């Protein structure tokens, strides 16, 4: 896939050198009230370097594709598209310094159109029902909530899972 250039952004396959900006996104996210609703990411430099190198390598196939979203030279967010039996599941994260400016919608709209142009007609996403900004973003992209599930990524002080309501969203073209 060639780079996608929107009005304000450049979207390209994730490169191993993107690790610094992605680490910054993960450090930023770990301080967010929404961090409790997502799988924790290691922010150790070596761990991040290795993980992003794997992402860059994986992006050479259609099963798992990772995209960096740039404003100028800065990676302000990323998106993942992971093949499922009947479509792709998407994931995304953006540095909070760039929230509320439409960058997520602009970049994800462009990526969804690119995949649609390659014959993909169904997309899935999951987010916590309490993550209002993410739910609002998915809705603005045309996703519909098709279900909910109890999800847990963390345990309490007694080792018991802490559950939250996760929404399952779907977009069909």
Regions found by a protein language model. Give the residues of each.
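Conserved GNAT-fold acetyl-CoA-binding loop/helix
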Residues: 30-54
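Acyl-donor (CoA/ACP) binding surface of acyl/acetyltransferases
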Residues: 1-32, 66-173
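A short helix-loop-beta-strand connector motif used in the catalytic cores of GNAT acetyltransferases and
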Residues: 53-67, 77
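Short, conserved alpha-helical segments within structured domains
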Residues: 40-44, 65, 130
